Amino acid sequence: MGIGLIMRLLDFSYADPCRNLALDEVLLEMVASGAAPDTLRFWESPAVFVVIGSSQRVQLEAHESNCLRDGVPILRRCSAGGAVLQGPGSLNFALALSYEHFPETASLHASYDFILGRVTAALCDLGMQVERQGISDLAIGGMKCSGNAQRRKRNACLHHGTLLYGVEPGLMGRYLTEPEDRPDYLGVRGHDEFVQAVAVAPARLREAIRRAFCPAALPETVSSAEEADVERLALDKYNSRDWNYRR
């Protein structure tokens, strides 16, 4: 169920990392409250930054000294999951879905099966040999190409994932520590040894995922109410040291 419903498509990126994170959270709140339809958003940060999961600690996930030296922000997102390096070459997709319209997403594991099943099929249709690894990763030949995470509410969820298509080699190892909690398939390999970009242009990635979830949708714009909420959250939360270093 779900596919074929009228969904909203947003292909919109802010220059500011805090606003990009804030908009994903705002979309969840708007869908959960019934103020906005189920939404698929694409975005890509023009600036490099580190984003950690909601329950992680900066000191364990990022090389703070390197980030500080290079002016790379370290931010905390609203969802669970592991640390990610954002920036050019990392395409993000975010789905804010109500359980009423997408009952397949009403439980955690079922939602990953549903969403990543469709993403995997869409990427395979582009000629890639993508397979699911662990709960929330996608890989090609044992090399990770996509990480995913969720935030869940009573009646809706936010699922967001990355698709790497051109990240500069060496940056992950410079800014991210090696994760202690990792899927078995990664073994003891470092970031630069287990992460691989997909050899597909970002426009084709966008189109494939759009067809998988909202084939009839045309790009829309962020509403004025959402813009106001983004500004508030970006300032009060995502730009706050209390939030980003809360653990």
What are these regions (language model features)?
Residues 44-46, 87-89, 132, 155-157, ...:
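A short, structural micro-pattern
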Residues 54-56, 95-99, 119, 134, ...:
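Short, structured patches in soluble enzyme cores that scaffold and shape functional sites
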Residues 69, 140-141:
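Structural motif
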Residues 81, 112, 141:
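Glycine-rich phosphate- or other oxyanion-binding loops that anchor nucleotides, phosphorylated ligands
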Residues 88-136:
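Contiguous, small/hydrophobic- and glycine-enriched helical/loop subdomains that border
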Residues 111-130, 146-247:
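Long, positively charged amphipathic alpha-helical accessory segments at protein N-termini or as interdomain linkers
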